[in-house]
Every structure is written in C-alpha cells, then in structure tokens.
Amino acid sequence: LEKTQLIERIRDETGWDIPWFVAQATYHVPGDESDPNIRAAQAALWEKGVALEGPDTDQLKGNLRGRNGQGVHFSGPGLHAHAKEWAEKVSPWLVQKTKSVKYKFSFGAIADCQYCRGPNRGSRHYASSAKKLHQCVQELNSHDLEFVIHLGDFIDRDYDSFDKVLPIYQSLKMPAYHALGNHDFDVADKWKAKVPERMGMQGRYYDFKVEGWRFIVLDGNDVSFHAYPKDSLEYQNAGVYYRENKISSPKWNGAVGGKQVAWMRKILETAEAKGEKVILYCHFPVYPADPHNLWNAKEVISILEEFSCVKAYINGHNHKGKYGQKDGIHYLTLKGMVETEDNAYSIISVHQDELKVKGYGRETDRRLLLK
C-alpha cells in the first residue's frame, strides 16, 4: 500500500483535511472489472467524492479501527482499503452497498479421518489422524464458516476410537455434520446400530439449508455388508441386492436404498421449485467411474441430472481424490486425511457463479464454475 502511505504522509505534513479512499486489490478474476455490481459500487463512491481503486470490491467486510477516531480499515479476500475523515460516512455505507451478491458463504470439508490406535499400514497413518484433526479444527475455527462436514470414515475401526476424535471434532465453533462411511461401522455387531447416534447425527441421511442453498447428506451404507450385524435381515438383503444386480464393485462399498432414493428425489423437487441450489454429500463417489463408487451410482447420477438445481456432489472414500464433471454437475472426491504424514482438508467458498476449493495440505485448489 505505497500509495496509501504516500497520501498519509502528504496529509500529515501539509495538514490538509481532504477526504480520500484508496484500495489495493491483490486478487481478482479476469473480467471482474466489467461486473455490473462492481461498476455500480465504484460509480456510487465517486458520487460521494470518494475514489475507489481496485476491482475486487464485492467481498468487503468492514472493521472500525479508529486512529484518533478517524480511521477505518476494510479487509476482504484480496482487498485492503483505508479511509480517513470520511470513515463514519463511508464505512457503514460501503459494507452495505458492496455486500457480495457473488460470494455467499464458506464451509469446511474433511474426508476420511479414519482414526484408530493401530500401527500405520502402508501410507495410512491411523493414529496420527487425531493430531491432524486437531490441527484442522484449529485452522477451521479461525475462519468464518457456516458449517463443517466430515465425509465418512471418521474412524477406521473399534467403537472406542470415537472417544478420541469426537471431542476434537465437537470443539468446532460452527455446526459440524457427518456423512456415514463404511469404516464407521467396523465395530462389534452390538454397536453398529448405535454408530449414528454416537456420532451425534440427526439421522442416517438428512438435509439442511444455508442462504438459498440446499445440502443433502446421503447414506451410502443404506444397503451394505458393513453397516449391519451378520445375522440381521439388512445384511441378508444386501446379499440379495448384490447378487441380483450382478455387482462387481467391492463389498466394502454400498448403495443408496429405494426409500432413501425416493426421499432424495422429493427434496430435489422441492429445491427446484423454490429456486434453491443443491450440493450433495456422501461418503462414496458416483462419478467418474471408479472401483470405489456406489453400487447404484448410475441410478443416482440419472436422478441428479433431472434437476438443474444440482450443482455438485462431494464425497470421500477414495483417498487419492478425484474429480469429474458431467452435464453441468461437479463430482469432487476429497483426499483422505489418514493418508501420509501430511494433512488434507479444504475450505469451500460458495459464490453465485462458482465454488472455490481452497485445499490444505495435500488437497488441491480448484475453481468449479456453476452453470
């Protein structure tokens, strides 16, 4: 901010009492300068006799700092702006007028913490996941997030593994959600039915809404060899489903059952009618083709493609991560936290026209444009 410092020096040395406003944009998307909302904000500031420099005005958040009662400091993704003298007039107006119609909110996403007290196996560092999760939670708590979701396989095995990592996850300062993974049910048969409640879940599958966006959390263990005791009817039904549908996918995957599929369709119909945008979460991927995919991935995809409100499907399970786009829907597999000594998680910011994935550790940064 050399220009800012120069103007401050001129003002201080001359004693001139002149209104001014200087901003420096360190980030902007090519083409932003033509955005009508930005142009409107700039024009309105000029009408007030305030010069605004820098295109990235749509993500400002105000924070009064007051140097001798006169200063105000604004900061946002890529913009630092300082105003003197006009602070009282400019600051509340600017925060109100430049509130982004593009940037909506952000959320944290984690996949496959997969903690247990066992020794490492290959690249999987099971016991280290507690430390990684703690580091992740500390970082996420330093951001203004609407919620955080863990995308399944919170533990690797053993019911008492929850005792170690749940308190860490529950120390998040924002709502914290779970999707169920196959390893979450790698516990003694007597504990399997208690897993969702132990994880603090409102149901095995559910939905919630944030600022015009509908989030649908699916249970890919609905039809499963992992989620039910071996002597249960559900386990037997999984065997029938697997044989009758001639599934070649590994048995550690699962399927979204018929009742849940009908529920999902109803939620999507409601979201479409209300003009909401939708992101789905599940432990298991559905696209691109992969051995980790849901048994009924094709069925799920065909339903999602019926609805223009569906923008993304985000999952875990495949620790290497993966990405694909099909018919305007983004399919994002996040990398598993349990893998290697390095961490992996992300903060995803929701904008009107894109999703921005900020990867931490091994996770990849991405821009997912919305149609």
Model-inferred region functions:
Residues 26-30, 58-61, 113-116, 154-157, ...:
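Solvent-exposed loop/turn segments at secondary-structure junctions
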Residues 98-163:
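N-terminal active-site segment of His-dependent metallophosphoesterases
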Residues 109-111, 148-153, 176-182, 218, ...:
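Active-site neighborhood of phospho(di)ester-bond hydrolases with catalytic His/Asp-centered motifs
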